[in-house]
Regions:
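Juxtamembrane membrane-water interface segments that cap and precede transmembrane helices
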Residues: 138-160
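Single conserved hydrophobic/aromatic residue that forms the stacking wall/gate
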Residues: 210-219
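Perimembrane helix-loop-helix junctions
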Residues: 90-114
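Membrane-interface helix-loop-helix junctions at transmembrane boundaries of multi-pass membrane enzymes
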Residues: 174-201
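Membrane-embedded helix bundles of polyisoprenyl
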Residues: 20-35, 44-52, 73
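Membrane-interface alpha helices of multi-pass inner-membrane proteins
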Residues: 69-85
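Transmembrane-helix motifs of polytopic, lipid-linked glycan transferases
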Residues: 2-13
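Membrane-interface transmembrane helices that cradle and orient dolichyl/undecaprenyl
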Residues: 53-68
Length: 219
């Protein structure tokens, strides 16, 4: 599902100038060679919500009435953070990028705030009605828990190899965007700069051994 949404995201916003299947093939190759990714984890649900959030953030680009787009973007960030609480940290980056996309106003900021809190309102109602308040407190406790910085010994070899490969791909791709960015439209350059910032932001939680995706499979 995540691979399909990545394809649609690229086709909808024209992030890559030339239509090709290489980037999709690489993604599916990475999934294939990682046995632990063949099961459905809570982090997979969070990843899909994350992609929906990016979609609506991109839709808000230079929109005069962007409150609705930011509401839905932060709604999915909030929903995903219930499964992976550290997604909440991306709210700061989302607000910064919304400002760069010229879509952040007081009204859209309020829409974003309401969107993020709505999943927690629903979670609170469920937890209160069934007397399971620990379910509501759990994401906030996870959010405030950090592991050791740069303690990579807890990672398995295939995890280190995957992270290293992704980092090399990021360096090459980011360098290409900087060198050949003048060939893209202004909107596309803004999207690509967002993806570069997002990738740098993603490597921050990787530095903390505790901030890994939930490892309890659903199936």
């Amino acid at each position: 599902a995540a691979g399909y949404f990545l394809i649609e995201l690229n086709n909808r916003f024209g992030i890559i100038r030339m239509r090709a299947s290489v980037q999709t093939a690489i993604y599916f190759l990475l999934v294939t060679v990682c046995p632990e990714m063949h099961l459905l984890y809570a982090g997979d649900v969070a990843a899909i919500a994350f992609l929906f959030s990016i979609y609506f953030l991109f839709k808000s680009y230079q929109q005069s009435q962007a409150a609705g787009y930011l509401f839905y973007s932060f709604l999915f960030i909030g929903a995903g953070s219930i499964f992976f609480p550290q997604l909440t940290f991306f709210s700061v980056l989302w607000l910064f990028e919304a400002y760069r996309f010229q879509s952040l106003t007081f009204r859209s900021f309020c829409g974003a705030l309401i969107g993020w809190t709505m999943p927690y309102w629903m979670l609170f109602g469920h937890a209160f009605f069934y007397d399971q308040m620990e379910l509501f407190y759990h994401p906030f406790r996870e959010l405030a828990t950090f592991g050791d910085l740069l303690n990579l010994q807890v990672l398995q070899p295939w995890e280190l190899a995957t992270l290293g490969y992704l980092f090399v791909l990021f360096i090459v791709s980011a360098a290409h965007c900087v060198v050949a960015g003048f060939e893209d439209k202004i909107r596309t350059r803004a999207y690509l700069q967002f993806l570069i910032d997002l990738t740098l932001f993603l490597f921050i939680p990787v530095s903390y051994t505790h901030l890994t995706l939930p490892t309890t499979p659903y199936v």
